[in-house]
Amino acid sequence: MGEWTWETGMNYNQIDEFERIRDYGLLVVYSNWSFLKNHFKENANYKKRKLGWVAYISGKRESRRLMGDYVLKEDDLRKHVFHEDGTAATTWTIDLHYPDAKNSQNFPGNEFKSIAKHIDIYPYPIPYSCLYSRNVQNLFMAGRNISVTHVALGTTRLMRTTGMMGEVIGMAAK
């Protein structure tokens, strides 16, 4: 039923409106399940099935980011700007998600399906100066909260890359 393209809250503030996003996501899941079981013409496959589990809290692609001594930007990635403090390499395209136009026709402003725009880049070393806070002493970041712009987050937010950032921060904290 669901897949990676199911995401809600693209038009809402990820921090201030989190409960609204969560509630709408649950509404989407249960409404689609009800449709498949009760109204879908070919519902024989769904009629006797049960919904086994639904995550109460969905994964956030983007939320708060802390400010480091450097903010990694799209220009850095596209122009392959050299930083002497380069660390873990990005391993993915710049992957940006937008509401799916077809879904927007039926649910304007409340889309729950997305499309991804991929911008090819070369693997890029994330500057160490993006992995620590510039104004909170001894605070490291290694994940979706690092010091990057929205577009740069599109390549740094992947699990393989965040895991490598964790290794870097673990060594730095020693």
What residue ranges belong to the model's regions?
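Flavin (FAD/FMN)-binding glycine-rich loop and adjacent Rossmann-like elements that form
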Residues: 1-174
